[in-house]
């Protein structure tokens, strides 16, 4: 089970990496989320929602300058509310906000983590479940 979940999460992260490489902005909540995603190899253009002087409407306006935007807020109640609001605001501005990666990651990790910054440690835990012994000695 852990191997399948690990592969599914890896597939989603590969998709996120690809989208970022294509220049599609990724809306995240804050600095720690960006650090976690960079640790996982995602280097796309990030737009942070928290820790900025901009209002959500201004962030939505800035993000909607591109036709497509990925929303990847945390999986808790606050993150879900932010995702809904940003989705509505950007859609009304003519952008194509994408919640698919967030929904799939949330579905796979819901019982285990509640935020993006916890993804690297969760993935490491899954790797240990799949292969608990170091392979250096073989």
From Swiss-Prot:
Similarity section: Belongs to the UPF0292 family.
Gene3D superfamilies per record: 3.40.1360.10
Binding locations of Mg(2+) 2: 74, 76
Xref: SUPFAM superfamilies: Toprim domain
Pfam families from the UniProt entry: Toprim
GO molecular function: metal ion binding
Protein name (Swiss-Prot/TrEMBL): UPF0292 protein MTH_890
Residues at which Mg(2+) 1 binds: 29, 74
Cofactor(s) the record lists: Mg(2+)
Organism expressing this protein natively: Methanothermobacter thermautotrophicus (strain ATCC 29096 / DSM 1053 / JCM 10044 / NBRC 100330 / Delta H) (Methanobacterium thermoautotrophicum)
Keyword vocabulary terms for this entry: Magnesium, Metal-binding
Cofactor binding remark: Binds two Mg(2+) per subunit.
């Amino acid at each position: 089970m852990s191997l399948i979940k690990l592969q599914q999460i890896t597939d989603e992260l590969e998709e996120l990496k690809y989208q970022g490489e294509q220049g599609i902005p990724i809306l995240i909540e804050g600095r720690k989320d960006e650090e976690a995603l960079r640790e996982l190899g995602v280097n796309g253009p990030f737009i942070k929602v928290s820790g900025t002087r901009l209002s959500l409407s201004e962030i939505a306006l800035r993000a909607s300058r591109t036709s497509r935007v990925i929303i990847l807020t945390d999986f808790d109640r606050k993150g879900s509310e932010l995702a809904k609001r940003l989705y509505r605001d950007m859609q009304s501005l003519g952008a194509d906000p994408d919640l698919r990666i967030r929904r799939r990651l949330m579905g796979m990790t819901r019982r285990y983590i509640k935020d993006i910054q916890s993804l690297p440690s969760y993935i490491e835990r899954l790797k240990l479940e799949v292969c608990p012994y170091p392979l250096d000695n073989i």
